[in-house]
Amino acid sequence: MTEFWLISAPGEKTCQQTWDKLMTATTRTNNLSTNNKFNIPDLKVGTLDVLVGLSDELAKLDAFVESVVKKVAQYMADVLEDSRDKVQENLLANGVDLVTYVTRFQWDMAKYPIKQSLKNISEIISKQVSQIDNDLKARASAYNNLKGNLQNLERKNAGSLLTRSLADIVKKDDFVLDSEYLITLLVVVPKTNYTDWQRTYETLAEMVVPRSTNLLFEDHDSGLFTVTLFRKAIDDFRHKARENKFTVRDFQYNEEEMKADKEEMTRLSTDKKKQFGPLVRWLKVNFSEAFIAWVHIKALRVFVESVLRYGLPVNFQAMLLQPNKKNMKKLREVLYDLYKHLDSSAAAIIDQSAMDIPGLNLSQQEYYPYVYYKIDCNLLDFK
């Protein structure tokens, strides 16, 4: 279970008492959740007006940063293609897995100095994550173009003999070249019609060179045959071939063109390999940065909301709960009983959400008498 509930409640005589009460209610007898203290440093409070405005801004920033974290994670999965099982081991925060980072969260004083105002810290995070978002768009666009061009070429070299590139199948010796009168055509013949082809190709038109057919290549359904004839008989031969279910490919042997195609394929393939390593490294580093920023926003939101709800001086205990999946409903009830005295208006809302009234919006349903934010470490939506 990778879902965490980050909550806070006011300090009793001491914050330790608040913690002990939660532990007794949720773990001592009933194993409802695994709990950790969530350490938030002494941040600068500022004025009430600023806190109220900041509360809304942080909610928007939270949603934006979460979306960037998910985008980076999803793009990592896209880039790693066949090794999706390796994605999780690349999605780390500060070199540790996400659950470990969240449960052992320590504020990063170097990145987000607590001498700065709350607004400044939120602006630092906003700027940092916007940069990651913009960089991701640019890098993804460049890599996707490269990958798309390579896939188009690969598609040309695969598929049916009726449409695929023939550059890697034919060679110069298969053709009569530089003749004023003669030309070699390539004909796709269904496997079931091989006998018909061998029996009739010389008589499909006048001026077909006898015994000039060779089988160059086969796929599941068809074979690619050569046939040499006089140029003036091409149209007649095409027409008769079509009537007999033989398809003449439009193909002119051009060594330079085929060489250029092969070189382009090699170049794109090499470029993709060259870009792959640095791109995965960039994604790892910036996933970590974005995820760390996201958890710091959660910490800021808990701090701001706790001050707005519980007042000054700052005295609350932030706690991180990892609910036991089978007991989530029970855990909500226990937390409600523990903290309902904090906010009487929450009682009505809890009762309503239990009844599941249609049209009651989620933000209202997710209002509790204690400060609550969800952190979900499952960031990948594998189709």
Curated annotation (Swiss-Prot):
Keywords, alphabetical: Acetylation, Hydrogen ion transport, Ion transport, Transport
Residues bearing the modification N-acetylthreonine: T2
Pfam families in UniProt: V-ATPase_C
Domain of life: Eukaryota
Gene Ontology MF terms: proton-transporting ATPase activity, rotational mechanism
Assembly with partners or alone: V-ATPase is a heteromultimeric enzyme made up of two complexes: the ATP-hydrolytic V1 complex and the proton translocation V0 complex. The V1 complex consists of three catalytic AB heterodimers that form a heterohexamer, three peripheral stalks each consisting of EG heterodimers, one central rotor including subunits D and F, and the regulatory subunits C and H. The proton translocation complex V0 consists of the proton transport subunit a, a ring of proteolipid subunits c9c'', rotary subunit d, subunits e and f, and two accessory subunits.
Protein family (similarity comment): Belongs to the V-ATPase C subunit family.
Role played: Subunit of the V1 complex of vacuolar(H+)-ATPase (V-ATPase), a multisubunit enzyme composed of a peripheral complex (V1) that hydrolyzes ATP and a membrane integral complex (V0) that translocates protons. V-ATPase is responsible for acidifying and maintaining the pH of intracellular compartments and in some cell types, is targeted to the plasma membrane, where it is responsible for acidifying the extracellular environment. Subunit C is necessary for the assembly of the catalytic sector of the enzyme and is likely to have a specific function in its catalytic activity.
Classification via PANTHER family: V-TYPE PROTON ATPASE SUBUNIT C, V-TYPE PROTON ATPASE SUBUNIT C 1
Protein name from the UniProt record: V-type proton ATPase subunit C 1-A
Organism field: Danio rerio
